[in-house]
Swiss-Prot record:
GO terms, molecular function: ATP binding; clathrin heavy chain binding; protein kinase activity
Name under which the protein is recorded: SCY1-like protein 2 A
Mutant phenotype after disruption: The double mutant scyl2a scyl2b has short root hairs and small shoots.
Cellular component GO terms, alphabetical: Golgi membrane; late endosome membrane; trans-Golgi network membrane
Organism: Arabidopsis thaliana (Mouse-ear cress)
Lineage start: Eukaryota, Viridiplantae, Streptophyta, Embryophyta, Tracheophyta
C-alpha cells in the first residue's frame, strides 16, 4: 500500500496547528494574555474607560535586553471573572455582558488605528483569554475621573493621586489639548466620539491630556444613516448601570442623543459633551447629576440660569453657554473654542503652549521665549512645573546651542523635585549633558553640582557625576578649577574612601602644586583641610609633604593661613602627639614669615602655644617663666603618678599632739627651729616608738606607683661630704633617729636675723626620703620634717658632742647642699625671702636687733652662707602632715607660734652655750 506523502504532510500540518493552538490557549489560561507575559506589573495607578472597568497598572518589560520605546508603560487589565460576578449580582443578562465586551473590543481596535498626539498611544494591542483582557499603552498618570475624586475600581489609591490638586492653569492647558484633539477627530479623522467624559480622558505621566474610549464613536458618514446609527435608551427613573454601561453617561451626553427620535448626531454632540466636561473641571462639580434619569436631565437642561454659571470665570461664561445650548447650530466648533479669551488672555498658558511646540521653533524664537520664561516660571505651581514645563525643557537640552540658556532653568526647577522624581524625570535628560559638557556649560554644572549630588544615589554619583568632576579637574579654565575644588568635599563625603584617595585626592594635590594662580592653590589647600577628617594618617602625611613643597616657594599670607587651617584639622582629627611630631616641624619655621600680619601671626603663635599647653597638661608638668618645672598633684610625670599619702601624715600629726612639749597649733616647725631644754630621760624612748610607728605606716599604706625620691642634693653627694650623716643613715635603717642637714629642709632657716638654734638643728632630717614618696615639686622636704620631727629629741643631746669639728663639717655640708638646691629651684629661696619679708613680728622679737644675736650666729656659721642655701616655704595652715608643699597661707599661722617659742627658749639656749 503506497502512502500519499502530500496527504500525510497536510494531515501533519493540521495536527501541528491544533497542537500549537492548544498550547497557546493553555499558556494563556495559566499566565494570562500576552501583555501580562511580556510585562511585569508594578502598582495600580488608577482606573478608566466606560464605567471605569479598566484597571491601569504601571509596568516594565520583562526582557530588558530588547529596546523599549518607554522605560515604563501602562498595562490595561479587565478581569472577566470579576465582571461576570458583578453582572450576576446586579441581575443583568449574559447578553449584556457580551455586548459590553464587544464595546471594549471596538474601543481598543479604533484606538490602535488612530495616531495623534492627543490620542492615547497603544504599544501592544488588546489580547484576551477566557479570564481577562489586557493591552499596553504609553505611561499614564490616571484618568480625569480619578483626578476629580472618582477612584472606583482602584484597590489602593496612590499617594500622588490622593493628594492631587489641579490648578486652573493646568485645567486650561488640558482643555485646550482636548479641544485640539476633537478638532482632529472632526476635521481629519471624520469621527464623532459621542462619549467625551472624565472616564475617557487620561493624563499621561508627562502631564498631557489625551482622549480614549472610542467604543461609541461613529464616522461622520454614518451620521445620516439611521439604520446604522446606534440608538441610546435612557429610562425615566434612576438607574445605576455603571457596571455594564451600554450607552454613554447621561451626565455628559448631548440632548439630541437622548431623544428617542433623533434626526442626526453631528460633531456638535461632542461639543456639548465637551462643555459639560469643561463645567465640571472649572466649577469642581458636575452640571448634571441625574443618575441616568432622563426626566431629571431634561429639567436641569431646560432651567439653566445665570446662577448656574456663578462659579465660572467671566471670560468663559458666554462660550460655555453657547456650547451647552440645546440648539446644535449655536454651538461653536472645537477650533472656535480654542480662540476663546479664556485661553488667549492668559500669558502663562501661552508660555505652556509654546513649550508644547518648542521643538518646532527656531533658536532665535526659543531664546526670546526663554528670557521671558526666566521671570515667569516662578508663578507656576509644582505640578505645572513638573509635568508641563520640565519635560519640554529637558528634551531641548539636546540642542547644544540652547544648552547654556535652558540648563540653568532646568536645574532651578529641579530644586523643587524630590529625589525619586529627579531620578525618574530630570536625571535621564541630564545624563547626556553631564557626559559631554564643556566650557560655560561645564562651569554651570560644577556650580550646581551639589544639587545633583544631593538628589542622586551612590550608583549614579559614581557613574555620572564623578566623571564630570574629573573632567573639571583637568580643565585649563581657572574658574572651573576653583569651582570643582569648592565642591570636592561634598562629593567625597558620599563616596567610598578608596575612590576619594584614588580619583579625587591626587588631582587636588596636582592643582595645589602645579598651579600658578593663587586662588586655585588656596582652594586646593582648603579642600585638603576639609578632607583631613576622611583620610588616614598615610594620606595626611602626603598632605604635609604637599604643604612643605607649597610653602617652600609660596609664603604669601593666604597660603600660610590655609596651611594653618590644615594643621588645625590634623590636630582635631589625630591629636597632640601626631601633630607635635609631624606638623610642628612645618609650622614653626613659618612663624618667621614677614608676610603674616599681626592677627595672622597671633593665630599661628596661639596654635603652637595651644599644642605646648596640651603637652604640659598631658605630662602633668608646667614650667613657669623662670624655667622651673612644677609637677601637679595627681598628675603623671615621667611615667609615674603622684599621690599624697595622707594616712601616714595624719598618724604623725596625732603622735605629735600626744606630746605635751609640742605646740598644739603647729608643733613640728617650732621644735625644729629652736632647741628645747634637755628633756626627761624617757624622751628618746618616745621618739623611737614614733619612728617605728611611722615605718609600719609606710609599708601598710598603698600608693598608685613606686615612690620617687625628689630630694636635692642627692644623698650620695651629701654622704660624701659628711661622714656622720652616713653613720646616722645606717642607724636610721635600723629604726633609730637620724641627723640630716637642716638648711635643706627647715622652712625657717633663712629668716634674718638667724638665731643660734637654727644651726644647732641642722642635723635632723636628710635620709628620711629613702622610703617616703614625694609630695610635690615645691615642698618635697616637708613630709621629711613631719616624719622625722620626733627624732630631734633623741639627737639634740648627742649633737653637741660633735664639737667644733662637727659644726664645721655641717657648715660645709650646708653650703654645698644649698648651692645645689638653689641651682635646681632658684625660686625656693626667693619664696622664703618673700615670706620672711611679710613676717615682721618674728624679726622684731627678742632676737630682732640685739647684739647677742650676732655673737650666737658666729658660733655656728655665717648668715651670708645660710641665706644662699636652698630654702623651703613653711607648711600650710592645715593640720600637720598634709604634705601640700610651699604655701603662703601657712605663714600667717607660723609667725606667732615660731616667735613665741623662740622667745621662751632663748635663756636655756644661752645657758647651754
Amino acid at each position: 500500500m503506497s502512502i500519499n506523502m502530500r496527504t500525510l504532510t497536510q494531515a501533519l500540518a493540521k495536527t501541528a496547528a491544533v497542537i500549537e493552538k492548544t498550547v497557546q490557549t493553555t499558556v494563556q489560561e495559566v499566565t494570562g494574555p500576552k501583555p501580562l507575559q511580556d510585562y511585569e506589573l508594578l502598582d495600580q495607578i488608577g482606573s478608566g474607560g466606560p464605567g471605569l472597568a479598566w484597571k491601569l497598572y504601571s509596568a516594565k518589560a520583562r526582557d530588558s535586553t530588547r529596546p523599549q520605546q518607554y522605560p515604563t508603560v501602562c498595562v490595561w487589565v479587565l478581569d472577566k471573572r470579576a465582571l461576570s460576578e458583578a453582572r450576576a449580582r446586579a441581575g443583568l443578562s449574559k447578553a449584556a455582558e457580551d455586548a459590553f465586551l464587544d464595546l471594549i473590543r471596538a474601543d481598543s481596535g479604533k484606538l490602535v488605528r488612530l495616531r495623534h498626539p492627543g490620542v492615547v498611544h497603544v504599544v501592544q494591542a488588546l489580547d484576551e483569554n477566557k479570564n481577562a483582557m489586557a493591552m499596553v499603552t504609553e505611561p499614564l498618570f490616571a484618568s480625569v475621573a480619578n483626578a476629580l475624586g472618582n477612584v472606583e475600581n482602584v484597590d489602593n489609591v496612590p499617594k500622588d493621586l490622593k493628594s492631587m490638586e489641579m490648578s486652573l492653569l493646568e485645567v486650561k492647558h488640558g482643555l485646550l489639548q482636548i479641544a485640539e484633539t476633537l478638532n482632529f477627530l472632526h476635521n481629519n479623522a471624520h469621527l464623532i466620539h459621542r462619549a467625551v467624559s472624565p472616564e475617557n480622558v487620561f493624563i499621561t505621566s508627562a502631564g498631557s491630556w489625551k482622549l480614549a474610549g472610542f467604543g461609541f464613536a461613529i464616522s461622520q458618514a454614518q451620521d445620516g444613516n439611521l439604520d446604522n446609527l446606534q440608538s441610546f435608551h435612557y429610562s425615566e427613573y434612576d438607574v445605576e448601570d455603571s457596571i455594564l454601561p451600554l450607552q454613554p453617561s447621561l451626565n455628559y451626553t448631548a440632548p439630541e442623543l437622548v431623544r428617542s427620535k433623533t434626526s442626526s448626531a453631528g460633531v456638535s454632540s461632542d461639543i456639548f459633551s465637551f462643555g459639560c466636561l469643561t463645567y465640571h473641571l472649572v466649577a469642581r462639580k458636575p452640571l448634571f447629576d441625574c443618575h441616568n434619569n432622563v426626566k431629571m436631565y431634561m429639567n436641569t437642561l431646560n432651567y439653566l440660569t445665570n446662577e448656574t454659571f456663578s462659579s465660572i470665570p467671566s471670560d468663559l461664561v458666554s462660550d460655555l453657554q453657547r456650547m451647552l445650548s440645546m440648539n446644535e447650530s449655536y454651538r461653536p466648533t472645537a477650533l472656535d473654542f480654542t480662540g476663546s479669551s479664556f485661553f488667549r488672555s492668559d500669558t502663562r498658558l501661552r508660555a505652556l503652549r509654546f513649550l508644547d511646540h518648542m521643538l518646532e521653533r527656531d533658536n532665535m524664537q526659543k531664546s526670546e521665549f526663554l528670557k521671558a520664561l526666566s521671570d515667569m516660571w516662578k508663578d507656576f505651581d509644582s505640578r505645572v512645573l513638573r509635568y508641563k514645563v520640565l519635560p519640554p525643557l529637558c528634551a531641548e537640552l539636546r540642542n547644544l546651542v540652547m544648552q547654556p540658556v535652558i540648563l540653568p532653568m532646568v536645574l532651578t526647577i529641579a530644586e523643587s523635585q524630590d529625589k525619586n522624581d529627579f531620578e525618574l524625570t530630570t536625571l535621564p535628560a541630564l545624563v547626556p549633558v553631564l557626559s559631554t559638557a564643556t566650557g560655560d556649560t561645564l562651569l554651570l554644572l560644577i556650580k550646581r553640582a551639589e544639587l545633583i549630588i544631593n538628589k542622586t544615589n551612590a550608583e549614579h554619583l559614581v557613574s555620572h557625576v564623578l566623571p564630570l568632576l574629573l573632567r573639571a579637574y583637568n580643565d585649563n579654565d581657572v574658574r572651573i578649577q576653583e569651582e570643582v575644588l569648592k565642591r570636592s568635599t561634598s562629593v567625597a563625603k558620599q563616596l567610598d574612601g578608596q575612590v576619594v584617595r584614588q580619583a579625587i585626592l591626587p588631582r587636588v594635590h596636582g592643582l595645589a602644586l602645579k598651579t600658578t594662580v593663587a586662588a586655585v592653590r588656596v582652594n586646593a589647600l582648603l579642600c585638603l583641610a576639609e578632607l583631613v577628617q576622611t583620610l588616614d594618617k598615610l594620606a595626611v602625611t602626603e598632605i604635609l609633604q604637599t604643604i612643605q613643597r607649597c610653602t617652600a616657594v609660596d609664603r604669601s599670607a593666604p597660603t600660610l593661613m590655609c596651611t594653618l587651617a590644615i594643621a588645625n584639622a590634623i590636630l582635631k582629627q589625630y591629636g597632640v602627639e601626631f601633630t607635635s611630631e609631624h606638623v610642628l616641624p612645618l609650622i614653626i619655621p613659618l612663624l618667621t614669615a614677614q608676610q603674616l600680619n599681626v592677627q595672622q601671626f597671633a593665630k599661628y603663635i596661639l596654635f603652637v602655644k595651644d599644642i605646648l599647653r596640651k603637652i604640659e597638661e598631658k605630662r602633668g608638668v608646667t614650667v613657669n617663666d623662670s624655667g622651673v618645672p612644677e609637677v601637679k598633684p595627681g598628675c603623671v610625670a615621667d611615667g609615674l603618678q603622684f599621690q599624697t599619702p595622707t594616712k601616714k601624715t595624719e598618724k604623725v600629726a596625732s603622735a605629735a599632739k600626744n606630746s605635751p612639749a609640742w605646740d598644739e597649733d603647729w608643733a613640728l616647725p617650732t621644735k625644729i627651729s629652736a632647741p628645747r631644754d634637755p628633756g626627761p630621760a624617757n624622751s628618746p624612748q618616745f621618739n623611737n616608738s614614733t619612728v617605728q610607728s611611722q615605718s609600719s605606716n609606710r609599708t601598710s599604706v598603698p600608693t598608685t606607683c613606686p615612690a620617687v625620691d625628689l630630694e636635692w642634693p642627692p644623698r650620695q653627694s651629701f654622704n660624701a661630704t659628711a661622714q656622720p650623716a652616713n653613720d646616722e643613715t645606717r642607724i636610721n635603717a635600723a629604726g633609730t633617729p637620724t641627723t640630716p642637714s637642716f638648711d635643706e629642709l627647715d622652712p625657717f632657716a633663712n629668716w634674718p636675723p638667724r638665731p643660734n638654734s637654727a644651726s644647732t638643728a641642722s642635723g635632723g632630717f636628710h635620709n628620711s626620703t629613702t622610703t617616703q614618696p614625694p609630695i610635690n615639686n615645691s615642698g618635697s622636704g616637708l613630709r621629711n620634717n613631719l616624719t622625722d620631727g620626733r627624732q630631734f629629741q633623741t639627737t639634740n643631746n648627742d649633737f653637741w658632742a660633735f664639737g667644733n669639728a662637727s659644726l664645721s663639717s655641717m657648715k660645709s655640708q650646708q653650703e654645698t647642699s644649698g648651692i645645689r638646691a638653689s641651682n635646681a629651684d632658684p625660686l625656693t629661696s626667693f619664696g622664703i625671702q618673700n615670706q620672711n619679708q611679710g613676717m615682721p613680728s618674728f624679726g622684731s622679737s627678742s632676737y630682732g636687733n640685739q647684739k647677742p644675736q650676732a655673737d650666737i650666729s658666729s658660733i655656728f656659721s655665717s648668715s651670708r652662707t645660710e641665706q644662699s642655701a636652698m630654702k623651703l616655704a613653711p607648711p600650710p595652715s592645715i593640720a600637720v602632715g598634709r604634705g601640700r608643699g610651699r604655701g603662703r597661707s601657712g605663714t600667717s599661722i607660723s609667725k606667732p607660734n615660731g616667735s613665741k617659742q623662740q622667745q621662751t627658749e632663748q635663756p636655756s639656749l644661752l645657758d647651754l652655750l
